[in-house]
A protein has these predicted regions:
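Conserved functional hotspots at enzyme active or ligand-binding sites that engage polyanionic ligands
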Residues: 1-114
Length: 114
């Protein structure tokens, strides 16, 4: 089971338009949530497209490290449930606490939580 904040790589990319595909997702679900199924709640990570630049639900993240790090955004409002078999078994990365706090702020606003 993947832990909250883990970056997962899709076994096959998910297409969302011409030339656009989603390869990486971040786990939003707590690892302490009862695992009654092989489903995990994730949000897509994508290139920071100009059309989405002002979208409140985007949280910046860098995939990779050092000079090879690629600036990306987590599109939190597009959260979804997916079975774990849709992802590679190895974790591709991990979000830092500051990124997770930003995700939490978006989730609270999106779901009208206090």
């Amino acid at each position: 089971m993947a832990d909250r904040g883990d970056v997962l790589t899709a076994r096959r990319t998910f297409g969302f338009g011409r030339g656009d595909s989603l390869e990486h997702f971040i786990v939003l679900q707590s690892a302490s949530f009862p695992g009654i199924s092989d489903t995990v709640v994730v949000a897509p990570i994508r290139k920071p497209l100009p059309a989405l630049a002002a979208w409140v639900g985007n949280v910046p993240i860098a995939l990779g490290s050092g000079a090879t790090a690629k600036p990306m955004v987590i599109v939190v409002p597009l959260l979804a449930a997916a079975t774990t078999d849709r992802f590679e078994p190895e974790v591709a990365g991990r979000a830092d606490p500051r990124t997770m706090a930003a995700i939490d702020r978006v989730l609270r606003a999106l779901l009208a939580l206090r």
